[in-house]
Design a protein with these regions (language model features):
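SH3/SH3-like (including bacterial SH3b) beta-barrel domains
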Residues: 74-87, 310-319
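Hydrophobic core
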Residues: 8-12
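Exported/periplasmic cell-wall-interacting domains
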Residues: 21-49, 54-59, 139, 179-183, ...
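SH3/SH3-like beta-barrel superfamily modules
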Residues: 23-41, 84-130, 328-339
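C-terminal segment of classical bacterial N-terminal signal peptides
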Residues: 13-19
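Positively charged n-region of N-terminal signal peptides that target proteins for export
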Residues: 1-6
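Gly/Pro-biased beta-strand-loop elements
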Residues: 118, 123-229
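Short, structured interface segments
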Residues: 106, 117-137, 265, 269-283
Length: 363
Protein backbone atom coordinates (compact mmCIF):
# COMPACT_ATOMS: atom_id res chain seq x y z
CA UNK A 1 0.00 0.00 0.00
CA UNK A 2 1.00 3.64 -0.51
CA UNK A 3 1.62 4.37 3.16
CA UNK A 4 3.88 1.38 3.86
CA UNK A 5 6.87 2.75 1.99
CA UNK A 6 6.38 6.15 3.55
CA UNK A 7 6.24 4.57 7.01
CA UNK A 8 9.75 3.26 6.36
CA UNK A 9 10.77 6.88 5.86
CA UNK A 10 9.40 7.71 9.30
CA UNK A 11 11.47 4.97 10.89
CA UNK A 12 14.67 5.82 8.99
CA UNK A 13 14.78 9.59 9.25
CA UNK A 14 14.01 12.06 12.00
CA UNK A 15 12.72 15.53 11.07
CA UNK A 16 15.02 18.52 10.94
CA UNK A 17 15.62 20.58 14.07
CA UNK A 18 13.40 23.58 14.71
CA UNK A 19 10.08 21.93 13.83
CA UNK A 20 7.44 21.94 16.55
CA UNK A 21 5.91 18.68 15.36
CA UNK A 22 7.81 15.48 14.75
CA UNK A 23 6.59 14.97 11.22
CA UNK A 24 8.29 12.61 8.76
CA UNK A 25 10.10 13.73 5.62
CA UNK A 26 9.22 12.50 2.11
CA UNK A 27 12.55 10.94 1.14
CA UNK A 28 15.09 8.46 2.50
CA UNK A 29 18.43 10.03 1.60
CA UNK A 30 20.28 13.33 1.40
CA UNK A 31 20.94 15.55 -1.60
CA UNK A 32 23.49 17.99 -0.17
CA UNK A 33 21.27 21.07 -0.40
CA UNK A 34 20.17 23.38 2.37
CA UNK A 35 16.59 23.30 1.13
CA UNK A 36 15.23 20.10 -0.36
CA UNK A 37 11.69 18.73 -0.64
CA UNK A 38 12.86 15.21 0.14
CA UNK A 39 14.54 16.19 3.42
CA UNK A 40 12.03 18.71 4.77
CA UNK A 41 9.35 17.64 7.31
CA UNK A 42 5.82 17.63 5.95
CA UNK A 43 4.35 20.51 7.94
CA UNK A 44 3.91 24.29 7.82
CA UNK A 45 5.56 25.15 11.14
CA UNK A 46 8.32 26.99 9.26
CA UNK A 47 6.77 28.77 6.23
CA UNK A 48 10.09 30.39 5.34
CA UNK A 49 11.72 26.99 4.90
CA UNK A 50 8.78 25.74 2.83
CA UNK A 51 9.05 28.78 0.57
CA UNK A 52 12.75 28.14 0.05
CA UNK A 53 11.94 24.55 -0.89
CA UNK A 54 9.35 25.80 -3.38
CA UNK A 55 11.84 27.94 -5.32
CA UNK A 56 14.67 25.40 -5.64
CA UNK A 57 15.64 23.88 -8.99
CA UNK A 58 14.28 20.39 -9.64
CA UNK A 59 15.74 17.33 -11.36
CA UNK A 60 13.42 15.84 -13.98
CA UNK A 61 13.58 13.13 -16.62
CA UNK A 62 13.81 14.58 -20.12
CA UNK A 63 10.92 13.72 -22.40
CA UNK A 64 7.30 14.47 -23.26
CA UNK A 65 4.85 15.52 -20.55
CA UNK A 66 2.56 12.50 -20.92
CA UNK A 67 5.23 9.81 -21.05
CA UNK A 68 6.49 7.65 -18.18
CA UNK A 69 9.96 6.14 -17.85
CA UNK A 70 10.58 2.97 -15.85
CA UNK A 71 12.99 2.81 -12.91
CA UNK A 72 15.05 -0.38 -12.79
CA UNK A 73 16.01 -2.47 -9.76
CA UNK A 74 19.63 -2.59 -11.00
CA UNK A 75 21.65 -0.32 -13.31
CA UNK A 76 20.78 -2.37 -16.38
CA UNK A 77 18.15 -2.27 -19.11
CA UNK A 78 17.48 -5.96 -18.45
CA UNK A 79 16.73 -5.49 -14.75
CA UNK A 80 13.31 -5.69 -13.13
CA UNK A 81 11.15 -2.56 -13.31
CA UNK A 82 10.31 -1.14 -9.87
CA UNK A 83 8.38 2.05 -10.60
CA UNK A 84 7.65 4.83 -13.06
CA UNK A 85 8.34 8.54 -13.28
CA UNK A 86 6.60 11.07 -15.51
CA UNK A 87 8.88 12.99 -17.87
CA UNK A 88 9.28 16.77 -17.83
CA UNK A 89 7.13 17.58 -14.79
CA UNK A 90 7.89 15.13 -11.96
CA UNK A 91 10.89 15.75 -9.72
CA UNK A 92 13.24 12.94 -8.71
CA UNK A 93 15.63 12.75 -5.77
CA UNK A 94 19.09 11.82 -7.05
CA UNK A 95 20.72 9.59 -4.44
CA UNK A 96 23.82 8.45 -6.31
CA UNK A 97 25.46 9.01 -9.69
CA UNK A 98 27.44 5.98 -10.82
CA UNK A 99 30.50 5.93 -13.08
CA UNK A 100 28.81 3.43 -15.40
CA UNK A 101 26.34 6.02 -16.71
CA UNK A 102 23.44 5.19 -14.39
CA UNK A 103 21.94 7.10 -11.45
CA UNK A 104 20.01 5.90 -8.43
CA UNK A 105 16.94 8.06 -7.77
CA UNK A 106 13.81 7.95 -5.67
CA UNK A 107 10.33 9.29 -6.30
CA UNK A 108 6.70 8.37 -5.82
CA UNK A 109 5.75 6.04 -8.65
CA UNK A 110 3.45 7.57 -11.26
CA UNK A 111 2.05 4.35 -12.73
CA UNK A 112 -1.45 4.72 -14.17
CA UNK A 113 -4.15 2.44 -15.57
CA UNK A 114 -2.29 2.18 -18.90
CA UNK A 115 1.03 1.24 -17.31
CA UNK A 116 2.79 -2.10 -17.42
CA UNK A 117 3.34 -1.77 -13.66
CA UNK A 118 0.80 -1.52 -10.86
CA UNK A 119 3.01 0.52 -8.53
CA UNK A 120 0.61 3.33 -7.72
CA UNK A 121 2.01 6.18 -5.65
CA UNK A 122 4.54 4.14 -3.65
CA UNK A 123 7.88 5.69 -2.75
CA UNK A 124 10.38 3.74 -4.88
CA UNK A 125 14.11 3.69 -5.54
CA UNK A 126 15.49 2.70 -8.90
CA UNK A 127 18.08 3.29 -11.58
CA UNK A 128 17.89 5.09 -14.90
CA UNK A 129 20.51 6.40 -17.36
CA UNK A 130 22.12 9.58 -16.05
CA UNK A 131 21.89 11.19 -19.50
CA UNK A 132 18.10 11.22 -19.13
CA UNK A 133 18.26 13.55 -16.12
CA UNK A 134 18.18 17.32 -16.32
CA UNK A 135 18.05 20.01 -13.66
CA UNK A 136 15.35 22.61 -14.34
CA UNK A 137 15.01 26.07 -12.86
CA UNK A 138 11.83 26.91 -10.94
CA UNK A 139 9.77 30.09 -11.25
CA UNK A 140 9.98 32.07 -8.02
CA UNK A 141 6.87 34.25 -7.81
CA UNK A 142 4.41 31.58 -6.64
CA UNK A 143 4.57 28.18 -4.98
CA UNK A 144 1.87 25.64 -4.11
CA UNK A 145 1.65 23.02 -1.37
CA UNK A 146 -1.09 20.38 -1.32
CA UNK A 147 -1.50 18.34 1.85
CA UNK A 148 -3.36 15.07 1.40
CA UNK A 149 -3.83 14.84 5.17
CA UNK A 150 -5.68 18.15 5.56
CA UNK A 151 -7.05 18.29 1.99
CA UNK A 152 -5.87 21.87 1.74
CA UNK A 153 -3.75 23.83 -0.72
CA UNK A 154 -1.42 26.45 0.71
CA UNK A 155 -0.67 29.25 -1.76
CA UNK A 156 2.62 31.12 -1.43
CA UNK A 157 3.43 34.38 -3.18
CA UNK A 158 6.81 36.14 -3.09
CA UNK A 159 7.95 34.40 0.07
CA UNK A 160 4.80 34.55 2.16
CA UNK A 161 1.92 32.19 2.79
CA UNK A 162 -0.92 34.04 1.07
CA UNK A 163 -3.99 31.88 1.67
CA UNK A 164 -5.46 28.42 2.17
CA UNK A 165 -7.82 26.67 -0.26
CA UNK A 166 -9.99 23.60 0.18
CA UNK A 167 -9.24 20.76 -2.25
CA UNK A 168 -10.15 17.19 -3.14
CA UNK A 169 -7.26 14.95 -4.14
CA UNK A 170 -7.56 11.50 -5.71
CA UNK A 171 -9.34 8.68 -3.92
CA UNK A 172 -7.68 5.30 -4.42
CA UNK A 173 -9.88 2.27 -3.84
CA UNK A 174 -9.36 -1.47 -3.99
CA UNK A 175 -11.03 -1.53 -7.41
CA UNK A 176 -9.26 1.60 -8.64
CA UNK A 177 -5.87 1.88 -6.86
CA UNK A 178 -4.57 4.10 -9.66
CA UNK A 179 -6.96 6.92 -8.74
CA UNK A 180 -4.91 8.32 -5.86
CA UNK A 181 -2.94 11.54 -6.36
CA UNK A 182 0.79 10.81 -6.55
CA UNK A 183 2.83 12.72 -3.98
CA UNK A 184 6.14 14.43 -4.72
CA UNK A 185 7.42 17.66 -6.21
CA UNK A 186 6.27 18.80 -9.61
CA UNK A 187 6.46 21.66 -12.05
CA UNK A 188 3.29 23.04 -13.58
CA UNK A 189 3.96 22.45 -17.26
CA UNK A 190 0.96 23.33 -19.43
CA UNK A 191 -2.32 25.22 -19.37
CA UNK A 192 -4.97 22.71 -20.45
CA UNK A 193 -8.12 24.79 -20.02
CA UNK A 194 -11.64 23.37 -19.75
CA UNK A 195 -12.49 19.73 -20.39
CA UNK A 196 -15.40 17.32 -19.96
CA UNK A 197 -14.88 14.34 -17.65
CA UNK A 198 -16.03 10.79 -18.44
CA UNK A 199 -19.06 11.39 -16.22
CA UNK A 200 -20.05 14.48 -18.22
CA UNK A 201 -18.90 17.09 -15.69
CA UNK A 202 -17.12 20.24 -16.87
CA UNK A 203 -13.77 20.96 -15.23
CA UNK A 204 -12.53 24.51 -15.74
CA UNK A 205 -9.09 26.15 -15.67
CA UNK A 206 -7.09 22.91 -15.76
CA UNK A 207 -3.30 23.05 -15.36
CA UNK A 208 -1.13 19.97 -15.93
CA UNK A 209 1.36 18.82 -13.28
CA UNK A 210 1.69 15.02 -13.72
CA UNK A 211 0.62 13.42 -17.00
CA UNK A 212 -3.19 13.18 -16.77
CA UNK A 213 -3.34 14.67 -13.28
CA UNK A 214 -4.35 18.32 -13.34
CA UNK A 215 -5.22 21.17 -11.04
CA UNK A 216 -8.73 22.36 -11.89
CA UNK A 217 -11.86 23.93 -10.50
CA UNK A 218 -14.76 22.11 -8.87
CA UNK A 219 -16.53 20.07 -11.60
CA UNK A 220 -20.09 21.05 -12.47
CA UNK A 221 -22.98 19.58 -14.44
CA UNK A 222 -24.96 21.80 -16.77
CA UNK A 223 -28.70 21.69 -16.06
CA UNK A 224 -31.42 22.00 -18.71
CA UNK A 225 -31.92 25.66 -17.81
CA UNK A 226 -28.23 26.39 -18.39
CA UNK A 227 -27.36 26.67 -14.70
CA UNK A 228 -24.07 25.22 -13.46
CA UNK A 229 -24.67 22.67 -10.70
CA UNK A 230 -21.59 22.23 -8.49
CA UNK A 231 -23.32 20.56 -5.55
CA UNK A 232 -22.40 16.91 -6.17
CA UNK A 233 -18.66 17.68 -6.19
CA UNK A 234 -18.42 20.81 -4.06
CA UNK A 235 -19.74 19.07 -0.96
CA UNK A 236 -16.72 16.74 -1.07
CA UNK A 237 -14.11 19.51 -0.90
CA UNK A 238 -11.91 18.82 2.10
CA UNK A 239 -11.89 15.07 1.45
CA UNK A 240 -10.50 12.70 -1.18
CA UNK A 241 -12.92 12.44 -4.08
CA UNK A 242 -11.27 12.71 -7.52
CA UNK A 243 -9.66 10.18 -9.87
CA UNK A 244 -6.20 11.72 -9.44
CA UNK A 245 -6.66 15.38 -10.32
CA UNK A 246 -6.74 18.05 -7.62
CA UNK A 247 -10.06 19.89 -7.44
CA UNK A 248 -9.73 23.40 -6.03
CA UNK A 249 -12.42 25.57 -4.47
CA UNK A 250 -14.23 28.17 -6.58
CA UNK A 251 -15.38 30.26 -3.59
CA UNK A 252 -12.99 33.14 -3.00
CA UNK A 253 -10.93 33.39 0.15
CA UNK A 254 -10.69 36.82 1.86
CA UNK A 255 -7.60 37.41 -0.29
CA UNK A 256 -9.71 36.85 -3.40
CA UNK A 257 -8.04 33.54 -4.28
CA UNK A 258 -9.75 30.57 -5.94
CA UNK A 259 -9.01 28.30 -8.91
CA UNK A 260 -9.77 31.05 -11.40
CA UNK A 261 -7.32 33.35 -9.60
CA UNK A 262 -4.64 30.66 -9.86
CA UNK A 263 -5.35 30.20 -13.58
CA UNK A 264 -5.00 33.92 -14.27
CA UNK A 265 -1.81 34.37 -12.19
CA UNK A 266 -0.07 31.18 -13.31
CA UNK A 267 -0.79 31.53 -17.03
CA UNK A 268 2.72 32.83 -17.74
CA UNK A 269 4.35 31.09 -14.77
CA UNK A 270 4.96 27.57 -16.04
CA UNK A 271 7.59 25.74 -13.98
CA UNK A 272 6.06 27.04 -10.79
CA UNK A 273 6.58 24.30 -8.22
CA UNK A 274 3.81 22.22 -6.65
CA UNK A 275 4.69 19.94 -3.76
CA UNK A 276 2.30 17.27 -2.54
CA UNK A 277 2.57 15.79 0.96
CA UNK A 278 1.33 12.25 1.39
CA UNK A 279 -0.99 11.37 4.28
CA UNK A 280 1.16 8.77 6.01
CA UNK A 281 1.35 7.34 9.54
CA UNK A 282 3.36 9.54 11.88
CA UNK A 283 2.15 12.88 10.58
CA UNK A 284 0.51 15.33 12.96
CA UNK A 285 -1.33 18.63 12.65
CA UNK A 286 -0.72 21.25 15.36
CA UNK A 287 -3.58 22.55 17.48
CA UNK A 288 -3.78 26.37 17.26
CA UNK A 289 -3.11 28.45 20.36
CA UNK A 290 -6.24 29.17 22.36
CA UNK A 291 -5.82 32.94 21.84
CA UNK A 292 -5.78 32.63 18.03
CA UNK A 293 -8.42 35.07 16.73
CA UNK A 294 -11.44 33.76 14.83
CA UNK A 295 -14.52 35.69 13.77
CA UNK A 296 -18.25 35.14 14.20
CA UNK A 297 -21.56 36.79 13.39
CA UNK A 298 -23.98 35.55 16.07
CA UNK A 299 -27.53 35.06 14.86
CA UNK A 300 -26.65 35.70 11.21
CA UNK A 301 -24.00 33.12 10.30
CA UNK A 302 -23.68 29.50 11.42
CA UNK A 303 -19.96 29.45 10.60
CA UNK A 304 -16.80 30.73 12.22
CA UNK A 305 -14.23 32.52 10.07
CA UNK A 306 -10.49 33.12 9.77
CA UNK A 307 -10.71 36.84 8.95
CA UNK A 308 -12.99 39.75 9.96
CA UNK A 309 -14.20 39.91 6.34
CA UNK A 310 -15.34 36.99 4.20
CA UNK A 311 -17.05 36.60 0.82
CA UNK A 312 -19.67 34.44 2.53
CA UNK A 313 -20.90 37.45 4.52
CA UNK A 314 -22.51 40.67 3.28
CA UNK A 315 -20.21 43.70 3.61
CA UNK A 316 -22.74 45.55 5.76
CA UNK A 317 -21.81 43.21 8.63
CA UNK A 318 -18.06 43.90 8.46
CA UNK A 319 -16.03 43.63 10.53
CA UNK A 320 -17.31 40.52 12.25
CA UNK A 321 -16.99 39.97 15.98
CA UNK A 322 -13.61 38.68 17.12
CA UNK A 323 -13.41 35.82 19.60
CA UNK A 324 -10.62 33.39 20.41
CA UNK A 325 -10.13 29.89 19.07
CA UNK A 326 -10.49 28.61 22.62
CA UNK A 327 -13.95 30.17 22.90
CA UNK A 328 -15.24 27.89 20.15
CA UNK A 329 -15.62 25.28 22.90
CA UNK A 330 -18.17 27.46 24.71
CA UNK A 331 -21.85 26.60 24.36
CA UNK A 332 -22.64 29.79 22.43
CA UNK A 333 -20.27 28.76 19.60
CA UNK A 334 -20.32 24.97 19.88
CA UNK A 335 -22.49 24.43 16.77
CA UNK A 336 -20.64 26.77 14.41
CA UNK A 337 -19.00 25.04 11.47
CA UNK A 338 -15.81 25.77 9.59
CA UNK A 339 -16.39 28.35 6.79
CA UNK A 340 -15.94 26.97 3.26
CA UNK A 341 -14.75 30.31 1.90
CA UNK A 342 -12.03 31.47 4.31
CA UNK A 343 -11.04 28.06 5.75
CA UNK A 344 -10.29 28.77 9.42
CA UNK A 345 -8.55 26.08 11.49
CA UNK A 346 -10.50 22.94 12.30
CA UNK A 347 -11.87 22.51 15.80
CA UNK A 348 -9.70 20.87 18.46
CA UNK A 349 -11.73 17.65 18.34
CA UNK A 350 -11.41 17.45 14.55
CA UNK A 351 -7.63 17.93 14.66
CA UNK A 352 -7.26 15.37 17.44
CA UNK A 353 -9.31 12.86 15.44
CA UNK A 354 -7.15 13.51 12.37
CA UNK A 355 -3.95 13.04 14.35
CA UNK A 356 -5.27 9.85 15.90
CA UNK A 357 -6.12 8.51 12.47
CA UNK A 358 -2.54 9.00 11.30
CA UNK A 359 -0.79 8.10 14.55
CA UNK A 360 2.45 6.22 13.94
CA UNK A 361 2.31 2.46 14.30
CA UNK A 362 3.97 1.53 17.57
CA UNK A 363 6.04 -1.58 18.12
Amino acid sequence: MRWIAALLVLMLLMPAAGYAQENPVPGTGTCGREYCYWETPMDLSDPETIWNVLIQPMTVVKGKQRVQVQLMAQPSEDAEMVGEVTCDSQGVHVLETLENGWSLVECYSSSNKLSKLDVYGDLVKGYLPTEMLEERETKTRYGLVVDEMTQRMYVFEKGRLLTTLRVSTGKATQKAPQCGTTAGEFHLVSMVGNFISESGATCEHAIRFNDGDLLHGVPYYLEDNGKKNYSSCERHLGEKASEGCIRIQRKRTPEGVNMRWLWERLFDQMHTKLIIWQDVPGRRQPIPAEDTPVYVLPGLSNAYHSKPTCYDIDKIYFPMEEITYGQLEEEAYARLHNCGYCNPPLRVQEIEALNQRYAAVEE
